[in-house]
Amino acid sequence: MAENKFKTAVLATPDLVYNEGKGALSNQYKRKVEVADCQGSVDIDFCLKDKTVGKNQCRWDYAIGSNNQSYFVEIHSADTKNIDEVTKKADWLKRWLKISAQNLDEIKHLPFYWVATSGIDVRNRNKMAKLATLNVKLVSSPLVIKA
């Protein structure tokens, strides 16, 4: 049986709960992400909401395993007014990976994905450029992760 590096990394990370397949994604969001060879998922936001590392923070939503990599996915409305919030979440994610989730950091896939819950209406190029420097890519749904 092939090693599941995603599951190993999740289990080595404090406070996270591993889920089979897309089990960590809420039902309304499962159709927003298509994953070939899904190796599991984590609801980062839920797992860390009451923990010191995540309490009162803008937290990233999900980690999804595929191809022995961790894909980080934020499912959020995509209007110009949401850019600052997603930027804060991406900043938090990068810090958390370096400080508390090094095993996931080692297998992270870039870019981080911001998946629009519906249409995309973003009109501020400067703020989008800031997201690009954080390796965040805004995509319409569904996000397709290929094997």
Task: Describe these PLM feature segments.
Residues 51-54, 78-82, 119-123:
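Short acidic, S/G/P-rich loop/turn micro-motifs used as interaction or catalytic elements
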